[in-house]
Amino acid sequence: MALFKITHENRAVYGGEKFARTVRCEYEYSKAQIAAMLPEMTHKFRCRDAHGITNFWGVCSESNSTAPLDCVGADHGCTEIQYKNPTTGRYETL
């Protein structure tokens, strides 16, 4: 499973709650291990709900992982994850 970090949230969706954090759903890592993995998180993603509203953005260690959606997306109504294509600059649904 990929390591990912939520970098921005849609405050209108969360009512201003702070949500940015590093997440690893199935396993716990030490702060040193997470710090070592942060440079690998270069793949930008966003998670959207069924109405096309982006609930949060982040970076992931893999470009084809559903981990952000699986771990926190459902709790926030997200049904879709998109990764930013580095060539076109556009987000594409996984």
Regions found by a protein language model. Name each.
Residues 14-39:
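Short, surface-exposed binding/anchoring microloops in extracellular/periplasmic proteins
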Residues 51-90:
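Acidic, low-complexity, intrinsically disordered interaction modules
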Residues 6, 22-26, 59-62:
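Generic detector of solvent-exposed, compositionally biased contiguous segments
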Residues 1-17:
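Transition segment at domain starts
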Residues 18-21, 45-47, 81:
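Generic structural motif
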Residues 93-94:
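Short, low-order "capping/linker" segments at domain edges
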Residues 6, 33-36, 40-49:
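A short beta-strand micro-motif
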Residues 1, 31-40, 85-90:
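Polar/charged alpha-helical tracts
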